[in-house]
From Swiss-Prot:
Belongs to the DNA mismatch repair MutS family. One of its GO terms (molecular function) is mismatched DNA binding. SMART domains: MUTSac, MUTSd. Coiled coil: none annotated. The gene is mutS. This protein is involved in the repair of mismatches in DNA. It is possible that it carries out the mismatch recognition step. This protein has a weak ATPase activity. This is DNA mismatch repair protein MutS. Pfam families: MutS_I, MutS_II, MutS_III, MutS_IV, MutS_V. NCBIfam families: mutS1, PRK05399.1. Keywords: ATP-binding, DNA damage, DNA repair, DNA-binding, Nucleotide-binding.
């Protein structure tokens, strides 16, 4: 079969056989071509024309292609969709080739190995992960080619592996073919990553991995390193020593809780805006932005480490002018980590090195500024900063101030840096000066005032004369070179001679400049470890000034840490406060301690229960990353873990219902929480029948109270459960206040002691714009239930009885005894508000967005 194809197609098929899982971009002249199934699939994914060509067989071969100069955009599209792309280049000059031009794959681009382009967000890492399965757990290794960072951790539970991979947003996971298929499928679906198989012989342990403890982490990282070697086919010298960490060194937040709390992205839109990261991000560098995300993902649990950050933040708050100067300096610092990575990979251009030079210019001032702060640790930080002055001198001496993007156009190297280059430039300049004089000489010689001397890349130098003046030219002196519509272009023997000298000089200039730049690039490589250390120092300073800036601008307070007490006075949800006018936000207290470990929260839907619960979790996270918190006063314990059961959504991927997801998340907290954990349970049990739900809710409350003792906020609509306050000494009731005003429920968003005594379900249904006749029917049914107490006269409906105590059914503000309800008179202002309500599609909004809209409309009624 192979023999029936042309030699070039045979070459293609041979290379493609080695890269079956990737699109093969096969270089043909100025295009990357794809053939056969690759072409069919690429034409669909990239929306490009599918054609065909003769390949030597009876049938024509499907083909499509993209121009090499714009290939990056097409490659990016494929990578975003989870595909891999193998770049196959011509490795010999076609003019010198005997037979088919030699080609080979020079790089395999995968979702986890993208080095540049729009596929890389400047404030996010691009980690690739490797997971290995062992008898007692899993090895996890992470590497970011763009920054050189490497991490490794041994984890007992696969759920924690998924949480770590989710935290770092790894786009690709490398496993062996023996890895459990079901587990691999879970990793792919829950983490949204591409799974890649690596079964190659693992190379000998390299220098950056020699310190790894145990065979588990060594095997896991070396599998990842082997995969990177195979795909990148170039030096990986910029990779830093593997940093080994343990989950217990930081606050543990499982995958679901990270999503529920919207730490780095929102649940609905998956965007940064609206998340805690969005709120806090006052960083000025890409490096600082990445470090901030890492800090949010892994809050500290050692008081000494937290307090060290707090002290630096407080110092920067107290030095306003120095902080503002620091922010301005950091703004001029480019991404040192990724610049170092580009240097190591050999794809750095002159403009990148100019960015490096401009960044290094800022470092001495930053070092001096930090050293001037009145704080011992700040002075120690300043003392450790290496400005890399020798590298700055080298770049200042060698690089042209405004080089082109291309490395083949010249103008890269400064005058005076290299003697031979200066000689070539003098030759080129002298020749061009001669040509500039030639135009005046020829005009004088011929008497043609419109005569021009010009140049283009196709025809070189020429003398242009309009056709009306051709009769003035001397016969035999001018050789025709090009005919235009209204003019002729000529060359003379003297011009031809100078052209050869100039073009030779310019060609020599470009070649020599490229050689000098390559040498310069190799010299810069020697500075990579120092640049990486400097990048780490700059990113830490940036993250700390970010905390100081947000804390001062938003009037946050420094939290104090306690053994067991929670005392938040006038606390605010940081993100909600930002999206609302700060004067409108209703702050709330949270008091918990030795005799108050659990809060049972009751109140209407959309009154702010979930916001209040998230608020406490976010304040705790902010405190443990070293930031100040939105409160008048904050005393907090150091939590080892945070668990949340908030929201309701079916897990369609794994075929789990809302209630099953709810129970699994509850189990995760119950099994893994300690007395030092924080648990948020929102509406546990609502996904099943009333009796089942109430029974489960009560049992969970009792279990957490009696067996775990963790700080727990438990919101519920089962008002019957509020009697547990009398039976469980650590449980206290609180509720969200709501009042009726002119037939309208006003949510006050205030947390008060005690249990709520009313529900507003029908009111919320009205806000959701359910049909009027449905609302009326609900009110009729509710009236009947109120009249019959706990024995509703409804056929085929189980008799409802409290799991804890018997109480009458919930009352409605909208029912008035047995009197027939009448529609109240509505004012013009109320009509306007009602119309505004009708235009809002609450079902497409998050609870937070809906609450904000309701609050705005409520203000109009006041």
């Amino acid at each position: 079969m192979m023999a029936s194809y042309t030699p070039m197609i045979q070459q293609y098929l041979k290379i493609k056989a080695e890269h079956q899982d990737a699109f093969l971009f096969f270089r043909l002249g100025d295009f990357y071509e794809m053939f056969f199934e690759d072409a069919k699939k690429a034409s669909q994914e990239l929306e490009i024309t599918l054609t065909s060509r003769d390949g030597g067989s009876a049938d024509k071969i499907p083909m499509c292609g993209v121009p090499y100069h714009s290939a990056a955009a097409y490659i990016e599209q494929l990578i975003k969709k989870g595909y891999k792309v193998a770049i196959c280049e011509q490795t010999e000059d076609p003019k010198a080739a005997k037979g088919v031009v030699k080609r080979e794959v020079v790089q395999l681009i995968t979702p986890g190995t993208v080095m540049d382009g729009k596929g890389i967000h400047e404030s996010e890492n691009n980690f690739i992960a490797s997971v290995s399965e062992f008898r007692d757990g899993y090895g996890l290794a992470l590497s970011d080619l763009t920054t050189g960072e490497n991490l490794a951790v041994f984890i007992e539970r696969i759920e924690d592996v998924m949480s770590e991979i989710y935290s770092v947003s790894a786009k690709e996971i490398v496993v062996s073919s023996k890895f459990n298929e079901h587990t691999a499928a879970q990793l792919k679906e829950r983490c949204g990553a591409t799974i890649s198989i690596e079964d190659g012989e693992i190379t000998e342990r390299i220098e950056i991995a020699k310190h790894l403890p145990g065979e588990e982490l060594t095997e896991t990282f070396m599998r990842l390193y082997t995969y990177l070697q195979k795909t990148q086919k170039r030096s990986l010298d910029h990779l830093q020593p593997v940093q080994v960490y343990e989950l217990e060194e930081a606050m543990k937040i499982d995958l679901y809780s990270k999503r529920n709390l919207e730490l780095t992205e929102t649940i609905r839109s998956k965007s940064k805006k609206g998340s805690l990261l969005w709120l806090l991000d006052e960083t000025k560098t890409a490096m600082g932005g990445r470090l901030l995300k890492q800090w949010i993902d892994r809050p500290l649990i050692r008081a000494s480490q937290i307090e060290e950050r707090q002290e630096m933040v407080e110092t920067l708050i107290n030095h306003l002018f120095e902080r503002e100067d620091l922010r301005e300096r950091l703004k001029e610092v480019y991404d040192l980590e990724r610049l170092a990575g580009r240097v190591a990979f050999g794809n750095v251009n002159a403009r990148d090195l100019i960015q490096l030079k401009e960044s290094l210019k800022q470092v001495p001032s930053i070092k001096e500024l930090v050293g001037s702060l009145n704080h011992k640790k700040a002075k120690e930080r300043a003392g450790l900063i290496d400005p890399c002055g020798d590298l700055l001198d080298l770049l200042e001496e060698a690089l042209h101030e405004n080089p082109p993007l291309s490395l083949k156009e010249g103008n890269l190297i400064k005058d005076g840096y290299h003697q031979k280059l200066d000689e070539y430039r003098d030759a080129s300049k002298n020749g061009k000066d001669w040509i500039a004089r030639l135009e005046q000489q020829e005009r004088a010689y011929t008497g043609i005032r419109s005569l021009k001397v010009g140049f283009n890349k196709v025809f070189g130098y020429y003398i242009e004369v309009t056709k009306a003046n051709l009769h003035l030219l001397e016969d035999g002196r001018y050789e025709r070179k090009q005919t235009l519509t209204n003019a002729e272009r000529y060359i003379t023997p003297e011009l031809k001679e100078k052209e050869a000298l100039i073009l030779e000089a310019e060609n020599n200039i470009c070649e020599l400049e490229y050689e000098l730049f390559a040498v310069l690039r190799e010299k810069v490589k020697q500075f990579i470890p120092r640049l990486q250390r400097l990048a780490k120092q700059m990113s830490e300073l940036d993250a700390l000034q970010c905390f100081a800036t947000i804390s001062e601008n938003r009037h946050y307070t420094k939290p104090v840490f306690s053994d067991n007490e929670v005392k938040v006075i006038e606390g605010r949800h940081p993100v909600v406060e930002k999206v609302m006018d700060s004067q409108e936000y209703v702050p709330n207290n949270c008091l918990m301690g030795d005799s108050r470990e659990m809060l049972l929260i009751t109140g209407p839907n959309m009154s702010g229960k979930s916001t209040y619960m998230r608020q406490i979790a976010l304040l705790s996270i902010m405190a443990q990353i070293g930031c100040f918190v939105p409160a008048k006063e904050a005393v907090l314990p150091i939590f080892d873990q945070i668990f949340t059961r908030i929201g309701a959504a079916d897990d369609l991927i794994s075929g789990q219902s809302t209630f099953m997801v709810e129970m699994l998340e509850a189990k995760n907290a119950i099994v893994n929480a300690t007395k030092d954990s924080l648990i948020l349970f929102d509406e546990i049990g609502r996904g099943t029948s009333t009796y089942d739900g109430m029974a489960l809710a009560q049992a969970i409350i009792e279990y957490v109270h009696d067996h775990i003792g963790a700080k727990t906020l438990f919101s519920t609509h089962y008002h019957e459960l509020t009697v547990l306050e009398d039976k469980l000494p650590q449980l206290k009731n609180v509720h969200v206040r709501a009042e009726e005003y002119n037939g309208t429920v006003v949510f006050l968003h205030q947390i008060k002691e005690g249990a709520a005594d009313k529900s507003y379900g029908i009111h919320v249904a009205q806000l959701a714009e359910l049909p009027d006749d449905l609302i009326s029917r609900a009110q009729e049914i509710l009236k009947q239930l109120e009249q019959t107490g706990d024995k509703p006269e409804l056929p085929a409906v189980s008799e409802k009885k409290s799991a804890v105590r018997e109480e009458p059914a919930q009352l409605s503000f909208f029912a008035d005894g047995e009197k027939e309800q009448k529609a109240p008179a509505v004012s013009n202002k109320e009509k306007q508000v009602l119309e505004a309500f009708k235009s809002i599609n609450i079902l497409d909004m998050t609870p937070l967005e809906a609450m904000n809209e309701m609050y705005k409309l409520q203000k109009k009624l006041k």
